[in-house]
Regions:
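PP2C/PPM-type serine/threonine phosphatase catalytic domain
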Residues: 1-240
Length: 240
């Protein structure tokens, strides 16, 4: 059994909310996307991606393929749909989105993701980031772990995405599978949340309450209070 709640806020500085999320406890499926593109195209790309993932998982024949493969296929399907829409409509040219999708079944956590929306796992009181950001700074730190992170964080390319759904000629869908236990908590966020809170603060909020609704509300409220200038989305799912 999984208890989950999600919350999204357009934030302190944005006119529109281009974040989208989905919670389907019957499918043990959770999705967060952060769209990009002018004229509301970002929210279109994010919603298309969320819809494609949910539809693909619902259509899965019993016993067919692993959840990780299924999630990968669903995101690839979203890529095709977004690129087709961009070719049909000039206003959608260049639109894209990040996405992180997770499914829990039979003691296994399956995750597929693109971009810098994140999934964290809280297990036995310890918080760990499961996904890895597809950003310029993450690429630089991966190639040179001894690099000056503080200096890189002030570089103008710091948060530029190196991978996105639909917005680039090629998209790489990353997948992760690992064991999960009763009592573990999943946290999925867009950068409007995790860019203004470190892992210590995120863990503190996750440990302060057992109710996913309260936790999600506190996460978004805290991000806004810390001056987040982006849309803020948090999904919290507790395995029971």
């Amino acid at each position: 059994m999984i208890q989950a709640f999600g919350l999204s806020d357009k934030g302190n500085s944005r006119r529109d909310n281009e974040d989208r999320f989905a919670i389907h406890e019957d499918l043990a499926l959770f999705v967060v996307a952060d769209g990009m593109g002018g004229h509301k195209a970002g929210e279109v790309a994010a919603q298309m991606t969320v819809d494609a993932i949910v539809e693909t998982v619902r259509e899965k024949p019993a016993g067919d393929r692993s959840d990780a493969d299924l999630l990968r296929t669903s995101i690839e399907r979203a890529c095709d749909q977004i690129r087709a829409a961009a070719l049909r409509e000039d206003e959608y040219a260049g639109m894209g989105t990040t996405v992180v999708a997770a499914r829990v079944a039979d003691g296994r956590l399956s995750v597929a993701y693109v971009g810098d929306s994140r999934l964290y796992l809280l297990s036995h009181g310890q918080l760990r980031q499961v996904t890895q950001d597809d950003t310029w700074i993450a690429t630089m730190l991966a190639s040179d772990p001894a690099a000056d992170r503080a200096a890189l964080e002030h570089h103008p390319l710091c948060h530029v995405l190196t991978n996105a759904v639909g917005a680039m000629a090629q998209t790489t869908v990353h997948v992760v599978e690992e064991a999960i236990e009763d009592g573990d908590v999943l946290l999925m966020t867009t950068d409007g949340v995790h860019d203004v809170m470190d892992e210590w603060r995120l863990a503190q909020l996750l440990l302060e309450d057992d109710d996913p609704r309260v936790i999600a509300e506190n996460l978004v409220r805290s991000a806004l209070a810390r001056g987040s200038r982006d849309n803020c989305t948090a999904v919290v799912a507790r395995c029971m």
